Curated annotation (Swiss-Prot):
InterPro entries the UniProt entry points to: Se-bd_putative_YdfZ
Keywords associated with the record: Selenium
Name recorded for this polypeptide: Putative selenoprotein YdfZ
Pfam families per UniProt: YdfZ
Species classification: Bacteria, Pseudomonadati, Pseudomonadota, Gammaproteobacteria, Enterobacterales
Chain positions with S-selanylcysteine modification: C52
The keyword tRNA processing belongs to this UniProt entry's keyword annotation: no
Domain of life: Bacteria
Native source organism of the sequence: Escherichia coli (strain K12)
Length: 67
């Protein structure tokens, strides 16, 4: 599933991202999309990033690189 970060860059599983509030970087391990609309996915805490204990909203992420 593709969703979009805070700058409207496409992010998917495997994308390298930075958490805007903390500066933590990592790869997206999964995006929970089951039964959700695109808007709910983008605004809800649906993304698991390696090294982060809690799920994050795509709007809290910034894509790093072009992957």
């Amino acid at each position: 599933m593709t969703t979009y970060d805070r700058n409207r860059n496409a992010i998917t599983t495997g994308s390298r991202v930075m958490v805007s509030g903390t500066g933590h970087t990592g790869k997206i391990l999964s995006i929970d999309t089951e039964g959700l609309t695109a808007e709910q996915i983008r605004r809800g805490k649906t993304v698991v990033v390696e090294g982060c204990e809690e799920k994050l909203a795509p709007l809290d992420l910034i894509r790093l690189g072009m992957n």
